[in-house]
Each structure stands twice: as structure tokens, then as C-alpha cells.
From Swiss-Prot:
Subunit structure: Alpha(8)-beta(8). The alpha component is a flavoprotein, the beta component is a hemoprotein.
EC numbers for this chain: 1.8.1.2
Effect of substituting G373V: In strain: AP213
Name of the protein described by the UniProt record: Sulfite reductase [NADPH] hemoprotein beta-component
Length: 588
């Protein structure tokens, strides 16, 4: 570790958070989880294990719709687990999907599969007694849930660009390599969930599981990584702790990456020491130094990230404490090379190409719109059965996108008609507005314990109301990137939307506006603690002006800033909470 006198280590003067004690005492993430699995008196986990299961890709939840009713009956909340699979780049094979579908139908409370905006799937409502069978199933089909939550590098995103097939494959391979390189070395996951063996702590174990990159207490906080291929910013590359922007050479081949750090969208209502942020550029690295750069950033965050205050522990706060130049210098010291100047690139859009597109390899790719990523069977839309039927005949692969949609990828010309017929039969191909196509929400109620307001369950009707507003003002064919998140933790990425709703209380939200279409700008708070109907009324007035006063092709988010309806967020750590503190500079 570097000299502790270096700027950025002031937090060491304060007591460590209890999570640091928990990790130290966990026997490399094993804890006493095996003992808890045998306890049939509760559906949940006790003590440290409640937190430790997160390192294995799970969260303990309960059904909040019936929580009060159960407490009234002197019953504990109906506890179960959320499981998040590790799936770098979101690619999954049809045979894997068939098994994933079967488990969801037979063993989860909600009998659904949730596609996430981090390009993976989640199970909701897995009972404790089915956890080991679930992990063994995943292991048997080449999958796992290692490090998809808690203080580690989480699922690595990669642009889903089926048209540029060769470049996408190259970038995807690096996304996989980064994911594997930054995984914990501990066998704790396999010992607990696959082998079911109790391993006592010993000196030999410490030598085997030294964790040369993550360290024995892993990272100070969650850590998110993405790989993007311009001009498509579908992964919201500015929202992650570590980002790789693919750069092509003159022959169209991948030659290296621009490396960006310090993005993140979570904050806390009323806590001005917290803020969402867009990532900063460190510079360019050629392909052969990609993993060294990833490791250098992780080690710098490991050593300098705040282990006292978890609310200020993400990379953006480490950079604020060290300065960007100081952070860059430490990363360069770790990887023993210097960053080259950032190479030119441009992002122009974020949305998925819904429908059929043809790749340069002449294969076809069908992107299916899945509202909020929820794959389930309803009488009018048996989507879950539809995807299962596709998996039974599809010869290519599936790709989960960072917009919560599903690509049926690598379809041969002769198979295209069959794939389309199945998709149409089960309602997987539908006519939707541009507004709905680009909308997103987190899960929120009833399963998320942090949710302050609804998100996924109110999004469909809310978008229908906004569709009426756009039609009223003759801009129904336009797109405004709209997102709802049930709390300020930011899982719905509302802090990179043109219209972002952040849950404040049941039925009430903070309304942020002024993000941009390419995902480069944080939206600012416009109205606080208002209802969905009040938000619709506010948007009605703003869209009326946008429809008549905008410049040619001017996006809604750009219009509200140019028209001085709202001030831009320029430097989030300075002016996110107070627009009067804006320092004139280039708007990010």
C-alpha cells in the first residue's frame, strides 16, 4: 500500500464501519451460513450471515404487501431471497434458459424472471430451503452468482451491438476477462452452495485465499464496471465506477480502451455529502494493458476508499478525496505504465434497436421489448412461455441488454420466420411508443426493502399518461428518456434520464429533469415530494413549451436547460444540491 501520508487517507483517523469487522471475521465469506441453512424456524439469515449472503449474489427480502398482515398475526415477515446471476455481457445460451425458466416456475414465489439493467437476470422469492439446489443448478449449467452484490466488482456490462458483430465479440471477450480477473479467489461460494462443506479457518486457508487483488476485506463498497462501444451508450458508461470505452483502429479493429472512473448514481435524500456523478477520464490503454488498468483501479480503490463511512465509499468519493490527478498517479503506479491521452469518441444514443437487425456476418438479431425486464405469464401476455418456446428452437444465443430487453441473437436467415412467428404468438412483438421503449424502472415494491415508493408496478400506467401528453402536443413520435426508481439508491438509473423520478414516500416522488439523450448529464431536482398526477401535470406544461419552442431536433433534456427552465448539473460534487454554486465550465 502507498505512503499513508498521501492525500485521500484522512478517513483512517475514524473507526472502521462494522462491515469491515464482518468481512474480517467471515472466514473468507463462509461465515456460519451452512448452520443457518439448517435452521427451519426462520426463513431468513441471522447476524453477519444476513450481510454475507450478498457476497454470494443474494439479498434477503420479504413480501412487503403482506408484511403488516403477518405481523398482526404474530408471524415473521414472509422472508425469501433475491438471487442475481453473474453474466458478464449478458449472453446466455438457450439450454441454460430452459433450466432457469424451470426453476423459476417450480420454486420461486413470483414465478417470474427479472431482466436487470446490469445485463443479467434475477430470481425473486427463493425460499431458504431451495438456495443450495438453485446454486447447484446454476453450477451445473456453467453459471454462478459470485460477487453480483456486496463489496466486490459486480456483473460487468458490455454494449449489446448485434450489427457490429466482430467488434462486439472482441469487446465481450474483454468484459468476460475483466469479470474473471476481478473475481474473489475464495472458494467460499463453492464450499457453501455447491459442495456444502464446512471449512474451518486455518493458516493454510489464508495462504490459499490470499486475495491478491481484492484483499482479505475486499473493497470498501460496491464496484461497478462497464464496457461500451461508441456510438451506442446502452450500458450508461458514465454511471459506473470503472468503464472501458472501446476504440477502433483505422481497420475497424479493437485497439484499446479509454478508461473512465468515478461514475455512480446513488445518493441519500437530504445528505449533501452524497451525490450522483458522471465518470471522469483517466486516459487510453492499449489492449495488452486492459487487465492491468482494471486491476490498478481496483487496488487503488481497495487501498484508498473510505472504510469508515460507507455513504462516502464509492470511487467518486475516493477521487474527490485524492483529486483526479492523485487517483490517476496511484493507478499508474499500480499498473506500472502511464495512461496515453484519451482517444476521440462520441456517443449519440442509448436505446436498443427494437425489432430485427442484420449483422455484418449476415446473421439476424431480434430485440424484444420487455417492459421493466419482467418476464412472466399473464393471460393477455404469456411472455415467459414465449421465451421458453423460443429457447426450445433457437440455435444461437440470447443477450440481455442494459435496457432490460432481450435479444434473440444469431438467427440464420432460414430460421427467421419461425422465430418471429413464436415471438408474435406470445406477445413478444408489440407496437409501443418511443417513450415506452426508452423507459426504465427498478423493481421496488413489494420485494425491495429499501423502496420508498412504487416503480415497476406504476411505470406502465405512468408512461400511458405521458403518451397522452405527447400526443396532445403532437410529439407522440418523439422520445424522452424517462426512468423511475423507488429510492435514491439509483437502480433504475433515473439520475441519467431526461425525466427522472426518485421515490420519496408512498405515492410521492422527486422530479428531476435535464439529463440528455446520450447519458452524459445528471438531471437536476425540479419539483420535490409530489404525486404522479402532479408530475404528469408538470410534464404537460414543459412538453407544451418544448413542442413549440424547441430548435430543430432538440431533445427535451437539452431544451429545458437552454430555455433556463432548469440549470444544468455541471460538477455534481459542487452543484448537484445547489445550482448557485455552478462554476462556469464545459457541461459534462
Amino acid at each position: 500500500m502507498s505512503d499513508k501520508k498521501i492525500k485521500g487517507l484522512e478517513w483512517q483517523e475514524k473507526p472502521l464501519s462494522d462491515n469491515e469487522r464482518l468481512k474480517t471475521d467471515s472466514n473468507f465469506l463462509r461465515g456460519t451460513i451452512l448452520e443457518d441453512l439448517k435452521d427451519g424456524l426462520t426463513g431468513g439469515f441471522k447476524g453477519d450471515n444476513f450481510q454475507l449472503i450478498r457476497f454470494h449474489g443474494m439479498y434477503e427480502q420479504d413480501d412487503r404487501d403482506i408484511r403488516a398482515e403477518r405481523l398482526e398475526e404474530k408471524l415473521e415477515p414472509l422472508k425469501f431471497m433475491l438471487l442475481r446471476c453473474r453474466l458478464p455481457g449478458g449472453i446466455i445460451k438457450p439450454y441454460q434458459w430452459i433450466e432457469i425458466d424451470k426453476f423459476a416456475r417450480e420454486h420461486t414465489r413470483y414465478q417470474s424472471i427479472r431482466l436487470t439493467n446490469r445485463q443479467t437476470f434475477q430470481y425473486h422469492g427463493v425460499p431458504k430451503g431451495k438456495l443450495q439446489p438453485m446454486h447447484r443448478l446454476l453450477h451445473s449449467i456453467g453459471l454462478d452468482s459470485i460477487a453480483t452484490a456486496a463489496d466486490m466488482n459486480r456483473n460487468v456490462l458490455c454494449t449489446s451491438n448485434p450489427i457490429e458483430s466482430e467488434l462486439h465479440q472482441q469487446a465481450y471477450e474483454f468484459a468476460k476477462k475483466i469479470s474473471e480477473h476481478l473475481l474473489p479467489r475464495s472458494r467460499g461460494y463453492l464450499d457453501v452452495w455447491v459442495d456444502g462443506k464446512k471449512i474451518e479457518s486455518s493458516d493454510d486457508l489464508l495462504k490459499i485465499e490470499d486475495e491478491p487483488i481484492l484483499g482479505k476485506t475486499f473493497l470498501p463498497r460496491k464496484f461497478k464496471t462497464a464496457v461500451a462501444i461508441p456510438p451506442l451508450n446502452d450500458v450508461d458508461v458514465y454511471a459506473n465506477d470503472l468503464n472501458f470505452i472501446a476504440i477502433q483502429d483505422d481497420n475497424g479493429q479493437l485497439c484499446g480502451f479509454n478508461v473512465l472512473v468515478g461514475g455512480g448514481l446513488s445518493f441519500e435524500h437530504g445528505n449533501t455529502k452524497t451525490y450522483p456523478n458522471v465518470a471522469y477520464s483517466l486516459g487510453f490503454v492499449p489492449l495488452e494493458h486492459t487487465l492491468a488498468a482494471a486491476e490498478g483501479v481496483v487496488k487503488t480503490q481497495r487501498d484508498f476508499g473510505n472504510r469508515s463511512d460507507r455513504k462516502n465509499a464509492r470511487v467518486r468519493y475516493t477521487i474527490q478525496n485524492m483529486t483526479l490527478d492523485g487517483f490517476r498517479a496511484e493507478v499508474e503506479r499500480c499498473m506500472n505504465i502511464k495512461f496515453e491521452p484519451t482517444r476521440p469518441y462520441e456517443f449519440t444514443e442509448r436505446g436498443d434497436r427494437i425489432g430485427w437487425v442484420k449483422g455484418i456476418d449476415n446473421n439476424w438479431h431480434l430485440t424484444l421489448f420487455i417492459e421493466s425486464g419482467r418476464i412472466t405469464d399473464k393471460p393477455e401476455k404469456p411472455l415467459m412461455t414465449g421465451v421458453l418456446e423460443l429457447a426450445k428452437v433457437h440455435k444461437g444465443d440470447f443477450r440481455i441488454t442494459a435496457n432490460q430487453n432481450l435479444i434473440v441473437a444469431n438467427v440464420a436467415e432460414q430460421d427467421k420466420a419461425q422465430i418471429e412467428a413464436i415471438a408474435r404468438q406470445y406477445g413478444l412483438i408489440q407496437e409501443i411508443s418511443k417513450l415506452r421503449e426508452n423507459a426504465m424502472s427498478c423493481v421496488s415494491l413489494p420485494t425491495c426493502p429499501l423502496a420508498m415508493a412504487e416503480a415497476e408496478r406504476v411505470l406502465p400506467d405512468f408512461i400511458s399518461e405521458l403518451d397522452k401528453v405527447l400526443s396532445k402536443h403532437n410529439v407522440a413520435d418523439e422520445s424522452i428518456i424517462t426512468r423511475i426508481t423507488g429510492c435514491p439508491n439509483g437502480c433504475g438509473r433515473a439520475m441519467l434520464a431526461e425525466i427522472g423520478l426518485v421515490g420519496k414516500a408512498i405515492g410521492r416522488y422527486n422530479l428531476h429533469i435535464g439529463g440528455d439523450r446520450a447519458g452524459l448529464r445528471i438531471p437536476r431536482l425540479y419539483k420535490e415530494n409530489i404525486t404522479l398526477q402532479e408530475i404528469v401535470n408538470e410534464i404537460d406544461q414543459l412538453v407544451a413549451r418544448w413542442a413549440t419552442e424547441r430548435q430543430t431536433n432538440e431533445a427535451f433534456g437539452d431544451f429545458v436547460i437552454r430555455s433556463n427552465i432548469i440549470a444544468p448539473v455541471v460538477n455534481a460534487h459542487i452543484d448537484f444540491w445547489d445550482a448557485t454554486k455552478i462554476i462556469p465550465t464545459t457541461i459534462i
